[in-house]
Amino acid sequence: EHIFSECPDITAVIQFAAYKAVGESVSKPIEYYYNNLNCTLVILDVMRHHNCHNFVFSSSATVYGDPASVPITEDFPTGATTNPYGTTKVFTERILQDVCKADPSLNVALLRYFNPIGAHKSGLIGEDPNGIPNNLMPYIAKVAVGKLEKVHVFGNDYPTPDGTGVRDYIHVVDLARGHVCAIKKLETNC
């Protein structure tokens, strides 16, 4: 509410606000459901009161669960999630679908992506976690700058040539550009 009051010309919102550690979501499901769903509901309510009609939701490929085949396409079924974090993304997407049906003036883009990595050269966009990182790239970065001696690779029984896991990554700068493009598309009342 405060941000909309201070900046009354806001025409779009990008929803990044969420807890995002998959492992932690398994041990703290109530916190994940409360935070991740409530953030979206509050934002949508404030947007409605300020006549803001463009919403980009930072979803996740976790909505697809553990698909039987790859590559995953946008029309794959969602909902068979394997953790509470993924389920919060599915529930939020469903909430947005319902709100759009009730309010045709609301334009929503759901962006489902895999593992954001990297940083902007300014250092303003990217991950430099406090404590133990939740994903691989912060470990690689720590090795690169000499804060860590080596990266440990866990798992050797995956169905890959060397037995290690395969991941899909997207650079944070590309991700930021994609979100800006989504806003521009929504603002044309697509």
Predicted regions and their residues:
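Alpha-helical substrate-binding/gating segment
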Residues: P116-A119, P138-T160, R167-C190
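Conserved Rossmann-fold NAD(P)-dependent oxidoreductase catalytic core, especially the SDR/UDP-sugar
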Residues: Q15, Y34, L41-P84, A102-A109
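NAD(P)H-binding glycine-rich loop region in Rossmannoid oxidoreductase-like domains
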Residues: E1-N35
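Short-chain dehydrogenase/reductase
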Residues: Y33, T82-V90, G126-P138, D168-Y169
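A short helix-coil junction within the Rossmann-fold of NAD(P)-dependent oxidoreductases
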Residues: K20-E24, V46-N54, V99, K185-L186
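Conserved cofactor-binding/catalytic machinery of classical short-chain dehydrogenase/reductase
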Residues: N38-V42, N54, F91-T92, H171-D174
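Hydrophobic positions on the long internal alpha-helix
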Residues: C39, I43-M47, L96, G178, ...
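Active-site Tyr-X1-5-Lys
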Residues: D66-A68, T82-A119, P138-L148
